[in-house]
Structure formats: C-alpha cells, structure tokens
Amino acid sequence: MKAAVFAYSRLGCKTAERAAGYFSGYQLRMFAPQRVKQGHFSLLPPHDPDFYGQQFAWADVLLFVGSCGIAVRQIAPHVRDKRTDPAVLVMDETAAFVVPLLSGHIGGANRLAAGLAAFMGAVPVVTTATDIHGRFSVDAWAAQKGYSIGDMAAAKKVSAAILEGDVSFCSEFLIRGTLPGGVVLRNSGPVGIYVGVHTAEPFETTLRIIPPVLHLGVGCRRGISAQAIQEAVEQLLAENGLDKRAIGMVGSIQRKADEAGLLEYCKKNHFPVSFYTEQELLAVPGSFTSSEFVRSVTGVDNVCERAAMVGASRLLVRKTAKNGVTAALAAEEMEVTFG
C-alpha cells in the first residue's frame, strides 16, 4: 500500500509526522512547501501542474493536513471513478478532525479515517448515508472482501433502497453469521444483491457481487496466441453463464511456464498464474477426463482439469477444447460472512 501526505504549515508538518506513524506499513511520501518543510519531507513544488495528478495516480491514500478546500482544489481535475480513485482524507493541522473526502467505501477512506482518528485522538467526520444510519454498505463490504462489483449503477440503486428499507440478498454460497442491517434473505424482489460466480439476475434490479474463487486450468498447443486463449475462455464462460471477474487464478503444467501466449493472456487480464509439475498434477484427487494422447506428451492424463483443481474444492466445468486450447474451471470452497 502507498500513501502520500501533504502539509502546508509548520504545525501541519508536525501533525503529519505524527500521522505518519499510522501509515508505518505503507510506502510513504511526505511533501511540504520549502518555507516549512523539515525532516522527512520532500519539496512540494509550487508551480508543477502535474504534481498532484502524479501522486493521485501513484497512491492508495492521500492525506491532506490542512483545509478541505485545499484538498478539493488539488484533486478535482483527477477524480475519475469511485472504483479506482484513491482514498482521500483531510485532517486539520491541530488533529481535531479527520474527514474522508473521497472513496469512502470502495477506497476505504471511511475505515482509514476512523483508524487515523483513533491513532491521533481526533474525531472522524463521516458523512456517507449508510454509515451514519448504521445500514449495510455493500460497496465497502465488497471492497473489504476483495469481491468485484458487477455494476456501479445497480450499486447506487441498492444503497438508496437500503436507506428506505430492507433489500433482498441471496448467494450461491453458504451464508455464515448474522446478516447486517438493511438486507434480508430473499430470492426475489424489486432490488437485491446476488453473490455468485454466475451471471444470474434474480431481482428486477440485481447487484451482482463476484468473489474471485474460480480457478482456470489451461492446456494449449505450443506457440498458441493470447487471442486464441482469450476466445476459448470467453466461449467457455459464455456457454456456462459465468462471469470472467470470478476467475481468481490460472494454472497449467510446468512445461508451459515459458508459453508466451499464455503469459500474455494472464498479464493482459491481471490473472496470477501458477505452473505445476507432473507429480503435483497427478497428486490432485478426483475423477478427470482422461486422454492417452495428452498422457503420452505431458505424462499427465489431463492438464486443464487437474490444474484447475489445485487448491479448489469442486470441478465446475470439465475440459472443453477450442482451436488448440483446452480449458476447465474449478471453484474454491467459500462462505459469505460479514465480519
């Protein structure tokens, strides 16, 4: 995690240095004007129009020790999307208040403001409606769990509905514990939240929350292109009604560790990839679609299904083949919790 801290006065610098302790596990940048900077501070350039944009793009958290007005003016040209914008906090130079200014839920600014306020002995000033009314914040929950939000427009409608009453909630996975305020278990209704890897929409307005619990196992012909792999996987997902964002990792046999097309596909889609030895794949328990030809070439009767099942609990989609690519999908064991 990366944090950038800005201070504008001598007292602000002292307060920022105290606040730096809260970000001790972060890559930390601290900036102040020449007239007040000291210690660990770098120069805050007075006439660089790209400076704040560069920090906005680099950091996960921006902390302005000063006024909200300063922060708003500096970040305004760079605000793009609540799914990707960093958390922006403002703390006054006396450390009396901490305000989460941007990305309160998905970026974690509300949580960070509460933590920083406790660390500094300050008061967190949280203004998001679900928080002040003690209702379920689905986008904050999804971000905390590392789940994808299917559609931000639906998320906005769900959040508005939660403020007016309870919304429906259903899941492909076992739900453990008590549901938070604002949601009730129902499989139908005008507005609802669906947690799963499929593209189902059980409600009139469905917010799909997608956990990355699918393992994609891949086997392929030597020299296969990334585009061919992309097309094979997209077809596999479409035919089985599965969401690509549910893929959490890709696996294959060790001899494919230098397969340029496979590596390019994984890089393009930001999928972590693991390669397994023949012995590791043969040790995977289960019943697989056996091929004597594949065994004669690789020493393993099935690469894609076995690779998909490493670390997973159930084989969801068996081996499919398209244009020199074989692929299978397996799912991890998962429970939905709210703690």
List the predicted regions and their residue ranges.
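Extreme N-terminal starter segment of soluble prokaryotic enzymes
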Residues: 1-5
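Glycine-rich adenosine-cofactor-binding loop
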Residues: 7-9
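Conserved mixed alpha/beta catalytic, RNA-binding, or beta-rich assembly cores of soluble enzyme
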Residues: 11-28, 32-36, 42-46, 55-57, ...
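Long alpha-helical scaffolds
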Residues: 16, 307-308
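A short, well-structured juxtamembrane/interface segment
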Residues: 48-50
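C-terminal non-catalytic interaction/assembly regions of soluble proteins
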Residues: 245-246, 251-306, 312-315, 319-325, ...
